[in-house]
């Protein structure tokens, strides 16, 4: 819980700094953070280094500097990462990137969601479903599509903290419960 609060504060601070320069800078900062967070996710040993209290802040600075050089991130993100190293918060980088993405989506008016189906949808059908959902939501929608044969048929749509379960499995479960109750 505390890590999330800390990550949110740092993400808001970086977002406010980028907002002064415009949406283009916000996008650049977001992509730089995503690259670094992706590197941390791909190499769990880096996360262990950043969480280890025995390793000094100077050593962590050296590690993050090498990572920053490798990915060629902006000076703002470089300085931000050095600040995180000095404050002992490099272990929060992935959480910071995730919340920064939420802030960026809110700024752009984008909502993210996941559409789960029992079978793979053709690209034309995906575009059609996405367009219909965008029209209904009145906002731009970034959808990820996944396949889960366990739902048997229909769709499960997750957007934010809302879930619309229109799957055959859910409908059969409701029918089963109704039969048990005698309805």
Swiss-Prot record:
Coiled-coil intervals, chain numbering: none
Protein name (record): ATP synthase subunit delta
GO molecular function, one term: proton-transporting ATP synthase activity, rotational mechanism
Compartments, as annotated in UniProt: Cell inner membrane
A GO cellular component entry from the record: plasma membrane
Record text on subunit structure and interactions: F-type ATPases have 2 components, F(1) - the catalytic core - and F(0) - the membrane proton channel. F(1) has five subunits: alpha(3), beta(3), gamma(1), delta(1), epsilon(1). F(0) has three main subunits: a(1), b(2) and c(10-14). The alpha and beta chains form an alternating ring which encloses part of the gamma chain. F(1) is attached to F(0) by a central stalk formed by the gamma and epsilon chains, while a peripheral stalk is formed by the delta and b chains.
InterPro entries membership: ATP_synth_OSCP/delta_N_sf, ATPase_OSCP/d_CS, ATPase_OSCP/dsu
Stored Gene3D superfamilies: N-terminal domain of the delta subunit of the F1F0-ATP synthase
PANTHER family (UniProt xref): ATP SYNTHASE DELTA CHAIN
PROSITE patterns: ATPASE_DELTA
Stored Pfam families: OSCP
Similarity section: Belongs to the ATPase delta chain family.
General function of this protein: F(1)F(0) ATP synthase produces ATP from ADP in the presence of a proton or sodium gradient. F-type ATPases consist of two structural domains, F(1) containing the extramembraneous catalytic core and F(0) containing the membrane proton channel, linked together by a central stalk and a peripheral stalk. During catalysis, ATP synthesis in the catalytic domain of F(1) is coupled via a rotary mechanism of the central stalk subunits to proton translocation. This protein is part of the stalk that links CF(0) to CF(1). It either transmits conformational changes from CF(0) to CF(1) or is implicated in proton conduction.
Keyword annotations of the record: ATP synthesis, Cell inner membrane, Cell membrane, CF(1), Hydrogen ion transport, Ion transport, Membrane, Transport
Membrane topology, record value: Peripheral membrane protein
Keyword Cell inner membrane set for record: yes
């Amino acid at each position: 819980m505390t890590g999330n609060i800390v990550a949110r504060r740092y993400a808001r601070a970086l977002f406010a700094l980028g907002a002064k320069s415009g949406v283009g800078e916000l996008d650049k900062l977001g992509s730089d953070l995503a690259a670094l967070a992706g590197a941390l996710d791909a190499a769990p040993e880096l996360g262990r280094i950043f969480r280890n209290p025995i390793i000094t802040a100077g050593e962590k600075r050296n590690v993050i500097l090498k990572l920053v050089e490798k990915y060629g991130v902006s000076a703002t993100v470089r300085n931000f990462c050095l600040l995180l190293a000095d404050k002992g918060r490099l272990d929060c980088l992935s959480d910071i990137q995730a919340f920064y993405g939420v802030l960026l989506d809110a700024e752009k008016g984008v909502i993210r969601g996941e559409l789960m189906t029992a079978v793979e949808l053709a690209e034309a059908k995906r575009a059609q479903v996405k367009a219909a959902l965008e029209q209904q939501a009145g906002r731009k929608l970034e959808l990820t599509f996944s396949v889960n044969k366990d739902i048997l048929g229909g769709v499960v749509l997750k957007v934010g903290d809302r879930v619309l379960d229109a799957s055959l499995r859910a409908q059969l479960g409701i029918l089963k419960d109704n039969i048990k109750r005698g309805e």
